[in-house]
């Protein structure tokens, strides 16, 4: 399941970074843009109430590390997109997230997202460093690893 939060959500910190992300990601319809995403692995027996959705979430926040942790999402603050996948695809995406847990934040890629010269998550590997991501990059890469998205989809 894909999870998104809008820039005007009460769960976000009031910071220059979130304001900048919101201004760069503005929507043509005037609604607050989505500025954060997470990939939620919901087991069939997952607990989905009328107010929350829970499972294992994979993402990263600014200056943080890729996480894969149990999380509960409020339906009031988050927007969800369900998707179907096979057990093999689910396992492949889960393994991808486990393999990248602890990777750092892609600061240069985040601030140069508009540039054709921005570093990709794996650009750092040739320097002997682990991959670096921002939230949409790790979510898209996980979906690509499970063949939910194909390689024609941009990485962010």
Where are these regions (language model features)?
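Short alpha-helical interface patches
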Residues: 68-81, 89-96, 146, 150-152, ...
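Activation targets extended, charge/polar-rich intrinsically disordered C-terminal tails
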Residues: 117-156
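Substrate-binding/catalytic groove segments of enzymes
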Residues: 48, 103-108, 145-153
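Glycine-rich catalytic cores of cysteine/serine-nucleophile enzymes that process amide/ester linkages
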Residues: 3-87, 122-127
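Short alpha-helical scaffold segments that flank and stabilize functional sites
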Residues: 6, 41, 100, 142-145
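A structural motif
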Residues: 84-119
């Amino acid at each position: 399941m894909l999870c998104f939060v809008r820039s005007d959500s009460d769960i976000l910190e009031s910071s220059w970074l979130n304001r900048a992300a919101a201004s760069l990601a503005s929507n043509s319809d005037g609604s607050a843009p989505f500025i954060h995403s997470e990939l939620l692995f919901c087991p069939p027996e997952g607990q989905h109430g009328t107010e929350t959705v829970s499972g294992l979430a994979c993402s990263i926040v600014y200056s943080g590390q890729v996480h894969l942790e149990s999380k509960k999402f409020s339906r009031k603050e988050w927007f969800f997109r369900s998707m179907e996948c096979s057990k093999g695809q689910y396992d492949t995406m889960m393994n991808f997230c486990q393999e990248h847990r602890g990777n750092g934040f892609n600061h240069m890629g985040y601030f140069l997202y508009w540039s054709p010269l921005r570093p990709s998550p794996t650009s750092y590997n040739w320097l002997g460093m682990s991959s670096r991501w921002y939230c949409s990059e790790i979510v898209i890469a996980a979906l690509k690893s499970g063949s939910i998205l194909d390689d024609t989809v941009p990485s962010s």
